[in-house]
């Protein structure tokens, strides 16, 4: 089947049509990235009135800073927990829809509710439930002799921000997994059932391979979400504490730039984070995507 390219009467019309998107991209993406790169090579006074070119000194200082290296590894752990937990839990709930006969519509609606909640509100909600003195969940844990105080325990603080972040993202993942599972031809599932395959075997041998492209897409989306969009959760829940136990790269950039007024260090950190995300995305699309294609 042959396809024909669109023909425009004016040679400038195609450029005019893409101009709005190009302008938005330049103003809100390329320009800020260029300024961040420029400031990362400067030594800037706290008020931004004067600067001096220092080359790569900011990056050298950065990787000799133990607090920055700690936030680097904290980001890796946090992103891994949020991405893996979010995908597994969402896939589990999406697979349960097939086995819920009564109230399936109510179940689906209930699963979509977290997506309507702002990230900061989601964090505050779980702070109330995990409040060391009056929280409902902490009271329940105390009945079993478990003392909860995320303001003093770094492990509990990490669990809280991961839990709140996963809960906020679960609706998005659930929606895509549910749509992918529903798109699988029922004839394949029925044929496997006739051959004697149980529900678990049918899921791992048929459903899971067929939804691999959607899983890969959600892997990339959740990784970006964990790197950037969880900032409101961390800020509202722990403010990066205790003792910087939940300070991720994006939160340290905010703290250095807006609280510490160190624009050069903040810009250098943002460049490192951008480079890290680009590398991870390229690796995923280059090596992981090739393993999820199917005929």
UniProtKB/Swiss-Prot annotation:
GO terms for biological process: transmembrane transport. It is found in: Cell inner membrane. SUPFAM superfamilies: MetI-like (SSF161098). It is a multi-pass membrane protein. InterPro entries: MetI-like, MetI-like_sf, UgpAE/MalFG_permease. One of its GO terms (cellular component) is plasma membrane. The chain crosses the membrane at residues 12-32, 81-101, 110-130, 157-177, 208-228, 263-283. Keywords: Cell inner membrane, Cell membrane, Membrane, Transmembrane, Transmembrane helix, Transport. Residues 33-80, 131-156, 229-262 are periplasmic. Residues 76-284 form the ABC transmembrane type-1 domain. Residues 1-11, 102-109, 178-207, 284-295 are cytoplasmic. Belongs to the binding-protein-dependent transport system permease family. UgpAE subfamily. The complex is composed of two ATP-binding proteins (UgpC), two transmembrane proteins (UgpA and UgpE) and a solute-binding protein (UgpB). NCBIfam families: PRK10561.1. Part of the ABC transporter complex UgpBAEC involved in sn-glycerol-3-phosphate (G3P) import. Probably responsible for the translocation of the substrate across the membrane. This is sn-glycerol-3-phosphate transport system permease protein UgpA. It comes from Shigella flexneri. The lineage of its organism: Bacteria, Pseudomonadati, Pseudomonadota, Gammaproteobacteria, Enterobacterales.
